[in-house]
Design a protein with these regions (language model features):
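C-terminal catalytic domain of photolyase/cryptochrome flavoproteins
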Residues: 1-142
Length: 142
């Protein structure tokens, strides 16, 4: 979701990568939950998160080469996602607090979020490692 990947690219990947990727499992889980491609027909909100939630849920950040609040691209990607799709989510009461917080973000932070999204998608689409591009994501304070 954070990268705006075409949802059927994800289902195609699952079908190619896993012999047990049956439509009745992949379609609702990948399209409905993972990609929020069905809108609110199946789920009440997209399943995306920023760095604070990831840190709270486990020790994933301890082995990462990015600093959780200074260089990690996840939170800027999170905010860029909501900025890009805020109109679609405006009537969703479960996202009201997220959208209010988004409104409070400065224009500078929003510009940094958008640039991080562009940098990450470009880097990954070129088959490069984000860790090699670590300097692109500096000053990403959450």
């Amino acid at each position: 979701q954070l990268m705006d990947i075409e949802p059927h690219q994800l289902t195609d990947w699952f079908h190619a990568a896993f012999v047990d990727a049956f439509d009745w499992v992949v379609e609702p889980n990948v399209l409905g939950m993972g990609a929020f491609a069905l809108g609110d027909a199946m789920m009440t909100k997209p399943y995306v998160s920023g760095t604070p939630y990831i840190k709270k849920m486990g020790d994933f950040c301890t082995s990462c080469k990015f600093h959780p609040t200074k260089s990690c691209p996840i939170s800027p990607m999170y905010w860029a996602y909501f900025e890009r799709h805020k109109d679609a989510f405006s009537g969703n009461h479960r996202l009201a607090m997220t959208l209010r917080t988004l409104q409070k973000r400065s224009d500078e932070k929003k510009a940094n979020d958008a640039q991080t999204f562009l940098d990450v998608t470009k880097t990954l689409s070129e088959g490069k490692s984000l860790h090699a591009q670590k300097t692109l994501f500096s000053n990403n304070e959450v």
